[in-house]
Each structure stands twice: as structure tokens, then as C-alpha cells.
Swiss-Prot record:
SUPFAM superfamilies: SufE/NifU. The keyword Iron-sulfur applies. The gene is ISU1. Residues 1-55 form a transit peptide. One of its GO terms (cellular component) is mitochondrial matrix. It comes from the Eukaryota. CDD domains: IscU_like. The lineage of its organism: Eukaryota, Viridiplantae, Streptophyta, Embryophyta, Tracheophyta. This is Iron-sulfur cluster assembly protein 1.
Length: 171
């Protein structure tokens, strides 16, 4: 991705046509641009940042795609009493589709129960963003990052429970 004069250019020779109309990729000179949802989440990513790893209410998923070099860190903060995800954030090093997939994933997991978020499929993210087949790996990373964050949170929770049992046995 290039940045010129405060505006991001999607690729040389491509322009976004702004205004009302269908939410579809814009073709200029035979090349397809990103879908407007990808552009929106890339230019205005939601929930960028990170939480403290040692916070017991935080689960961290770190995944990567060696083929393209994309790396995605997605974190969730869970209300321990309700099991509901109350916040989420991400940091992604990768293409616009990877950043958009991360941004969408954090939006979708907020306010949901842990059991719900592990059912989010990459195909749903890809469909929402209208990702082309060559970019499906970006949505797969987002799905994997969600599952890894949930697994990390559950492992932390189990470790804390075990420590609590050990302390109770010592007393």
C-alpha cells in the first residue's frame, strides 16, 4: 500500500470512485480495486492496540502466514463472571485485507460469549469484505487468531484455578 498526500493509494493506476451506489469493487483500466468495506477498515481500523499480556482476563492469539508474511495479534478481554467478551483489539503487520479482516474480527467478537466467537468462520469474514480467492488466507488468519485468543484465555483461567487449588491444599 502506498500513501500519497494524506490519501492511501490502493495500487498504481487505481482510483476509488466515491459517492453513493453499490458496495462493489471499482475497476479502472481492467484492474480491480479493494471492496469499499476493506478500504474502510484499512483506512479507519477499529480497535487497534494491545492489552497487558499478564492480565488474567485477557486472551492473546498470535498467528502468521509464512507464505505472505502477514502476522496478526488479536486480543480479547473477558468479563470473568459472565464469560462475555467485553473488549478486543489487534495489531497486524500485513496487507490491507489482513488489516481489514482483523478489524472486522474485533468488531464481531465484542459483546459475544466465548462459545459464540469460536463459531465465527473465515468464510463469513471473507464474504462480508468481498475478499477475492487470493486473499482468503487473510480471513483464515482472523479466524485462527480468534480461536487462539480464546484458547489462551482458557489456558490462563485453568492455570489460575490450579494455583488456587494448590494454595487451598497447602492451607
Amino acid at each position: 500500500m502506498l500513501r500519497a498526500g494524506g490519501r492511501r493509494l490502493l495500487a498504481p493506476g487505481l482510483r476509488r470512485v466515491l459517492g453513493g451506489g453499490a458496495a462493489a469493487p471499482v475497476a479502472v483500466g481492467g484492474a480491480k480495486a479493494y471492496h469499499e468495506r476493506v478500504v474502510d477498515h484499512y483506512e479507519n481500523p477499529r480497535n487497534v492496540g494491545s492489552f497487558e499480556n499478564d492480565d488474567p482476563s485477557v486472551g492473546t492469539g498470535l498467528v502468521g502466514a509464512p507464505a505472505c508474511g502477514d502476522v496478526m495479534k488479536l486480543q480479547i478481554r473477558v468479563d470473568e463472571s459472565s464469560g462475555k467478551i467485553v473488549d478486543a483489539c489487534f495489531k497486524t503487520f500485513g496487507c490491507g485485507s489482513a488489516i481489514a479482516s482483523s478489524s472486522v474480527a474485533t468488531e464481531w467478537v465484542k459483546g459475544k460469549q466465548m462459545e459464540e466467537v469460536v463459531t465465527i468462520k473465515n468464510t463469513e469474514i471473507a464474504k462480508h469484505l468481498s475478499l477475492p480467492p487470493v486473499k482468503l488466507h487473510c480471513s483464515m488468519l482472523a479466524e485462527d487468531a480468534i480461536k487462539a485468543a480464546v484458547k489462551d484465555y482458557e489456558a490462563k483461567k485453568a492455570k489460575l484455578a490450579q494455583k488456587g487449588e494448590e494454595k487451598a491444599a497447602e492451607a
